[in-house]
Curated annotation (Swiss-Prot):
Organism for this UniProt entry: Pseudomonas putida (strain ATCC 700007 / DSM 6899 / JCM 31910 / BCRC 17059 / LMG 24140 / F1)
EC number, as in UniProt: 6.3.2.8
Biological pathway: Cell wall biogenesis; peptidoglycan biosynthesis
Reaction(s) this enzyme catalyzes, per UniProt: UDP-N-acetyl-alpha-D-muramate + L-alanine + ATP = UDP-N-acetyl-alpha-D-muramoyl-L-alanine + ADP + phosphate + H(+)
Origin superkingdom: Bacteria
Gene transcribed to yield this protein: murC
Chief place of localization: cytoplasm
Entry protein name: UDP-N-acetylmuramate--L-alanine ligase
Keywords, comma-separated and alphabetical: ATP-binding, Cell cycle, Cell division, Cell shape, Cell wall biogenesis/degradation, Cytoplasm, Ligase, Nucleotide-binding, Peptidoglycan synthesis
Keyword Cell inner membrane in record: no
Localization per Swiss-Prot or TrEMBL: Cytoplasm
Any Gene Ontology CC annotation: cytoplasm
C-alpha cells in the first residue's frame, strides 16, 4: 500500500544547531547541506572556490567561506567532512582542539536516514542513475521522498530535496567504505568492480566482504535488491542473510528484462516479474546498463506497492541526470552537425557501457571521444583495461590525467596511454597538452553525423559547455529540456 502524503515529523539532533561543512561544494556534501538547511539548521561551509553549487546554497541561507581558515569553524556545533579532506585542514584542527565533533559525510547522511525508511543504492557503477530513477518513480507514485544524489537531477534542478514522506533515497558510497555507517530498510547492489582499491588494501576479497557487511546493516525484515547479471554480486549472494530480490537479464532473476529495443536515446523493453503481468517500459536513456538501473528501480517500487502505471510514468518521464550521457546539443560542421554528449564515466566498465550504448543506438555514426583519466592510481591499476576500451572509439583525444590530489605515477599518464593504444594498431590517439583549447583541435576531426563525447570525472566536465559557446561552433543548437 502506498502511503498518503503527510508531513513527516522531523527529528532534531540534540544540541546541534550550527553545522559546518568542510568542502561544501563537493557533490557528496552539498546535497546533505541543502537537506539540513531545509530542516531548519544553521549551515555554513567552506570550499577552495565559489561555484554555482555554493551560490545556490548561499541563496538558501548557508554562510559560505572561500578558503579554509580556522575561524570558519569556530562557532560550529559539528563539522562534516569528506574523505577528500586532509586531517591537517585548519578547520578540522580547530574543531578537534575545541572538542567539536568531526563526522564523515556518511555519518551525517546516516543520521538523516535514522528515523526514515531509507533506500540506499550501492555499487561501483550506476548508483547515481538508479537513485535518480527511484526518486522519479516514487514521486510519480504519489510519494514525496527526500533524496540525496551524486548528480544533478534534471527535472528537480538539484541533487537533493527534502520530502514530506518517510522515504529517504540516497547513494551509498563504497569508495571509502563509509556506506557502512548507513542502516537502510532497502539496499541495492548494482555491481561490484575493482575501484578505490587503496581503501581495501588492494584486496578484492575485502571489498566483497565489505559489501556483505553493508547488506547486513539491513534489519532482518529489510530487503536486499541485487543484480544477478554481475558475477561478483552473484558470488556473494549466498552469503547474504537477509530477504533478497534479484534482477537482470538472466532467466534466474526475480525481475528481468526481455525484448530490449534501442532507438537513439530511447530504450524500450518488457519486464517479467514473478506472479505479475508483463510490464512494457520505456526510458529516455540508451544502453543495457540503464535497463539494469531501471530494473532495480522497478524491483523496489513493486515491493513498496507503487502501481504499475506510476512505475511506467516515472520511468518514461525521467529527464536524466547531469553528466550521465547528457546531450548538450548539436555542433555545426560542414555538411551537417555533430551530437555533443557529456558523460561522467571514469572507469573502463563505464566507458565500455557508453560505447556499447552508442553503437546500439546510432550504429552508423562515428564515435569521437575526448577522455580525461581520473587519478593516477586508477589509471595504473586499470591500465590494460583502459587501453582496450578506449581503443574502441573511432577518434580518441586524451587529456592529461586529472590528479584529484594525487602525485604523478610513472607510466600512468595519458602520454603513455596514447603510446599503448597506438601500439594496438586500431587508431592513433591525440594527446592534448594541458591548457590547450579544445575547439580548434577537435573541429577539423569532426564529420557530419558524428557523436562527440567529453568523458571523465575531472575538469573535462567543463568542456561541453565551452564547445557550445565557442565562436568556432557559432550556431550551435542547445538541447531542449524534455
Amino acid at each position: 500500500m502506498v502511503e498518503s502524503q503527510k508531513a513527516m515529523p522531523q527529528p532534531k539532533m540534540g544540541r546541534i544547531r550550527r553545522i559546518h561543512f568542510v568542502g561544501i561544494g563537493g557533490v557528496g556534501m552539498c546535497g546533505i547541506a541543502e537537506v539540513l538547511l531545509n530542516l531548519g539548521y544553521e549551515v555554513s561551509g567552506s570550499d577552495l572556490k565559489a561555484s554555482p553549487v555554493t551560490e545556490r546554497l548561499e541563496s538558501f541561507g548557508a554562510e559560505i567561506f572561500v578558503g579554509h581558515r580556522a575561524e570558519n569553524a569556530a562557532t560550529a556545533d559539528v563539522l562534516v567532512v569528506s574523505s577528500a579532506i586532509n586531517p591537517a585542514n585548519p578547520e578540522v584542527a580547530t574543531a578537534l582542539e575545541r572538542r567539536i565533533p568531526v563526522v564523515p559525510r556518511a555519518e551525517m547522511l546516516a543520521e538523516l536516514m535514522r528515523y526514515r525508511h531509507g533506500v540506499a543504492v550501492a555499487g561501483t557503477h550506476g548508483k547515481t542513475t538508479t537513485t535518480s530513477l527511484l526518486a522519479s518513480v516514487f514521486a510519480a507514485g504519489g510519494l514525496d521522498p527526500t533524496f540525496v544524489i551524486g548528480g544533478r537531477l534534471t527535472a528537480a534542478g538539484t541533487n537533493a530535496q527534502l520530502g514530506t514522506s518517510r522515504y529517504l533515497i540516497a547513494e551509498a558510497d563504497e569508495s571509502d567504505a563509509s556506506f557502512l555507517h548507513l542502516q537502510p530498510m532497502v539496499a541495492v547492489v548494482t555491481n561490484i568492480d575493482a575501484d578505490h582499491m587503496a581503501t581495501y588494501e588492494g584486496d578484492f576479497n575485502k571489498l566483497k566482504k565489505t559489501f556483505v557487511e553493508f547488506l547486513h546493516n539491513l534489519p532482518f525484515y529489510g530487503l536486499a535488491v541485487m543484480c544477478l547479471d554481475d558475477p561478483v554480486v552473484r558470488e556473494i549472494l549466498p552469503q547474504v542473510k537477509r530477504p533478497t530480490v534479484t534482477y537482470g537479464f538472466s532467466e534466474e532473476a526475480d525481475i528481468r528484462a526481455i525484448n530490449v529495443r534501442q532507438q537513439g536515446m530511447q530504450t524500450h523493453f518488457t519486464v517479467l516479474r514473478r506472479d505479475r503481468e508483463p510490464l512494457e517500459v520505456s526510458v529516455n536513456m540508451p544502453g543495457n546498463h540503464n535497463v539494469l538501473n531501471a530494473l532495480a528501480t522497478i524491483a523496489i517500487a513493486t515491493d513498496e506497492g507503487i502501481t504499475d502505471e506510476a512505475i511506467v510514468q516515472g520511468l518514461s518521464g525521467f529527464q536524466g541526470v547531469g553528466r550521465r550521457f547528457q546531450v548538450y546539443g548539436e555542433l555545426p560542421v560542414e555538411g551537417g552537425s555533430v551530437m555533443l554528449v557529456d558523460d561522467y564515466g571514469h572507469h573502463p566498465t563505464e566507458v565500455a557501457a557508453v560505447i556499447k550504448a552508442v553503437r546500439g543506438g546510432w550504429p552508423s555514426r562515428r564515435l569521437v571521444i575526448v577522455y580525461q583519466p581520473h587519478r593516477y592510481s586508477r589509471t595504473r591499476d586499470l591500465y590494460d583495461d583502459f587501453v582496450q576500451v578506449l581503443g574502441d572509439a573511432n577518434v580518441l583525444l586524451l587529456m592529461e590525467v586529472y590528479p584529484a590530489g594525487e602525485e604523478p605515477i610513472p607510466g600512468a599518464d595519458s602520454r603513455q596511454l596514447c603510446h599503448s593504444i597506438r601500439q594496438r594498431g586500431k587508431l592513433d590517439p591525440i594527446y592534448i597538452e594541458r591548457g590547450v583549447e579544445l575547439a580548434p583541435l577537435v573541429k577539423p576531426l569532426l564529420r557530419a553525423g558524428d557523436i562527440l563525447i567529453c568523458q571523465g570525472a575531472g575538469d573535462v566536465g567543463g568542456l561541453a559547455p565551452q564547445l557550445m559557446k565557442s565562436p568556432l561552433f557559432a550556431g550551435a543548437k542547445q538541447e531542449k529540456s524534455k
